[in-house]
UniProtKB/Swiss-Prot annotation:
Keywords: Chaperone, Cytoplasm, Disulfide bond, Redox-active center, Stress response, Zinc. The gene is hslO. Belongs to the HSP33 family. It comes from Limosilactobacillus fermentum (strain NBRC 3956 / LMG 18251). It is found in: Cytoplasm. This is 33 kDa chaperonin. NCBIfam families: PRK00114.1.
Length: 293
């Protein structure tokens, strides 16, 4: 099944609802970063959560950076997402495998840690000062933490479900999630019914493994109730790095630092943390940067 996200309104405009299948892009992140099972699940959930936040809360060319800093063995996780449904990510320690938790599932909270922060920085073209909101982690499972962020930082009552199923060989079998936002004027009856449904809902990974599409996941949540699909959009892992961008970073270094690279290494190599692409700068290119200072 292809990776894509759907946007909808439900219960005659009482809820906004989003669902995404992100299996291929989470597998791509696994391939790029050589993530082990617990790290794959943590990184995958962070990427799916960022996709849902970015596509629901941004417009045009705007983007956001989500940083999760817990006290678990994976260290920090950084994810960039855009309104267009693209995402890229990296993490401090991708080689984390843990025993299964008490429910027999991958221990994402153990990998991320239960103490730490989740921050979201939003940037739009022309913005001089980006907006950043930050909350403490509440569980380290990440779905709860994104839900808490939306309630505390954006004052949007929401429910976020994130799920990644990792195979025994560390490949990603399925990955996806949903985001439901309660809109002003939603009735107590509708909210209570939704809460009951979500408590009984299977894991998103189980629904995806059954072959359910993002539309069918939302139909399962709002079974027998009004649901209007508004948009279907592709999502993908996409890095926008370039040699020009790394050259600007090198140009910001001091003359002494650049000269040291010339004298010791006769050049420089930059590696993108998001995609692993390597960019080589020759001795002549570095000398040009020194001469322009």
């Amino acid at each position: 099944m292809e990776d894509y996200l759907v946007k909808s309104v439900a219960e005659n405009g009482q809820f906004r609802a989003y669902a995404v299948n992100a299996t291929a892009l989470v597998e791509e992140a696994h391939q790029i970063h050589d993530t082990w099972s617990a790290a794959s699940a943590a990184l995958g959930r962070a990427m799916v959560g960022t996709l849902l936040l970015a596509t629901s809360g941004l417009q045009g060319e705007a983007g956001m950076t989500v940083k999760i800093q817990g006290d678990g063995p994976v260290g920090f996780i950084v994810v960039d997402g855009t309104a267009q449904g693209t995402v890229k990510a990296y993490m401090q320690n991708p080689h984390v495998h843990l025993p299964l938790n008490a429910k027999g599932k991958i221990d994402v909270a153990g990998a991320v840690g239960k103490t730490g922060t989740l921050s979201v920085t939003k940037m739009a073209p022309g913005d001089k000062t980006p907006y950043t909101g930050e909350v403490n982690l509440v569980s380290g499972e990440l779905g709860d933490d994104f839900t808490y962020y939306l309630a505390q930082s954006e004052q949007i009552p929401s429910a976020v479900g994130l799920s990644v199923f990792v195979q025994s060989d560390d490949h990603i079998e399925v990955a996806g999630g949903f985001l439901i936002q309660v809109l002003p004027g939603a009735s107590d009856e509708a909210i209570n019914h939704l809460e009951t449904t979500l408590r009984e809902l299977p894991l998103v990974s189980d629904l995806l493994r059954e072959g359910k599409t993002p539309e069918q996941i939302l139909e399962t949540i709002f079974a027998g109730r009004d649901l209007k699909i508004l948009e279907k959009m592709p999502v993908e892992y996409k890095c926008d790095c370039s040699k020009d961008r790394f050259e600007k970073a090198l140009a910001s270094l001091s003359k002494d630092d650049l000269q040291e690279m010339i004298d010791n290494d006769h050049g420089a190599e930059a590696v993108c943390r998001f995609c692993g692409h390597k960019y080589h700068f020759s001795e002549e290119e570095l000398k040009y940067l020194v001469a322009t200072k």
